[in-house]
Amino acid sequence: MIKERVKMEVIGLEIPLISGNEEYTLAELISKYPLEENDIIVIAETVVSKSEKNVILKDTIKPSNEAIELSKKLGKEPEVVQVILDESNETVRLGPNFIVTETKHGFVCANSGVDESNTSKGIKPLPKNPDKSANEIRKGIEEITGKKVGVIINDSMGRPFRKGSCGVAIGVSGVCGLWDRKGEKDLFGRELKTTEVGIADELAATASVVMGQSDEGIPLVIIRNAPVPFKEGTGKELIRKKEEDVFR
């Protein structure tokens, strides 16, 4: 016998292009949609960075000698390489046309998350403090709507040992980031000893299927009826400590 157990809804929303000069906040914009209790709102990091005016014009960047030399190896503009270096704590690896860095947030990713996609001009770093941004957006939405919600800021990142980019959570508020299930029982009554679920990453990846990574124009996704814990989480709790990382 087959029976339904869980039905989760994923709703992609088109919004006006964000420039950073709007007379409304992201919370005010998102609240115009009829949200429901325990909706999870996933927002593309591009929208958050642009709304926070975190875009750097190329003519304001003075590349260092290091950036100029690296740009020759990578086939990238020196200005772009300079921003990548500025946004990083350290360089982890050099690829053929990318740099794997640890960002100032602690993320290990290509090019410090810096890109020029879906930005009409300038270079766009990641939001300065994604958890803080997610929290401010969530609190704004809850104040306006009276509904309890979760907010995730997502970005697409490549993965070591697997091809293809995938959505990940870089900022989290109002929903669990890392779901610790140790001590629970499996179907046969055995106690789970090590299970920790990167639930915010799973939600971010789910939203990315609808958002797309090209010209879809869907930077906002509502996930409804998600079977996840609604407790205060962060994106930082998903970052593996350097001393626990066996691949670095």
Swiss-Prot record:
Q: Which domain of life is it from?
A: Archaea
Catalytic reaction(s) noted = oxidized coenzyme F420-0 + GTP + L-glutamate = oxidized coenzyme F420-1 + GDP + phosphate + H(+); oxidized coenzyme F420-1 + GTP + L-glutamate = oxidized coenzyme F420-2 + GDP + phosphate + H(+)
Statement: the UniProt record of this protein carries the keyword GTP-binding: yes
A single GO molecular-function term is: GTP binding
Q: What HAMAP family does the entry give?
A: F420_ligase_CofE (MF_01258)
Q: What is the purpose of this protein? A: Catalyzes the GTP-dependent successive addition of two or more gamma-linked L-glutamates to the L-lactyl phosphodiester of 7,8-didemethyl-8-hydroxy-5-deazariboflavin (F420-0) to form coenzyme F420-0-glutamyl-glutamate (F420-2) or polyglutamated F420 derivatives.
What this protein is called in its record is Coenzyme F420:L-glutamate ligase
Upper taxonomic lineage: Archaea, Methanobacteriati, Methanobacteriota, Methanomada group, Methanococci
Q: Which gene encodes it?
A: cofE
